[in-house]
């Protein structure tokens, strides 16, 4: 997928909602995001906004540095269990699935990491299957959206006068 103006329609973290998440929850989420971004050993343009989101939500410079280094080295960050912010755990998982879908492909390494993260979130294994089904559909819908918006560029306007 080429980098285009489609970025105006991408999903991002909303700063006002981040204020409700504990620092521990933000660190966990940022580490999970970075791990998903690099598990396939590449960082494409469509994923860079998520990397920025992950870095910017962290106030601790040492942890920010750890995340930046892990991207540079393409090494997954150690991720423990999410014990705080349980009310947001489902939202975190869907956000991580959107990170997987950002480049328009779902790779085996990403599937394996999402399965692992499911356990770290304390969810039953079938939750991972539901999320993977959803992310597969999201990738298909994003491709369909891209095809439609591409075809709409070539349509000459037809205005109906009243």
What is the predicted role of each segment?
Residues 1-162:
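Small-residue-enriched hydrophobic alpha-helices in membranes
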């Amino acid at each position: 997928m080429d980098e285009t103006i489609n970025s105006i329609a991408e999903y991002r973290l909303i700063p006002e909602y981040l204020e409700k998440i504990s620092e521990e929850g933000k660190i966990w989420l940022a580490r999970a995001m970075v791990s998903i971004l690099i598990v396939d050993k590449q960082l494409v343009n469509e994923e860079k906004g998520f990397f920025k989101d992950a870095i910017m939500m962290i106030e601790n410079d040492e942890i920010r540095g750890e995340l930046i280094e892990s991207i540079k080295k393409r090494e997954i960050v150690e991720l423990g269990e999410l014990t705080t912010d349980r009310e947001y755990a489902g939202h975190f998982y869907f956000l991580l699935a959107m990170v997987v879908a950002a480049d328009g492909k779902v790779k085996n390494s990403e599937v394996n990491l999402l399965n692992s993260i499911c356990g770290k979130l304390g969810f039953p294994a079938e939750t991972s299957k539901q999320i993977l089904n959803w992310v597969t559909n999201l990738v298909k819908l994003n491709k369909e959206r891209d095809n439609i918006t591409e075809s709409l560029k070539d349509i000459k306007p037809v205005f109906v006068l009243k």
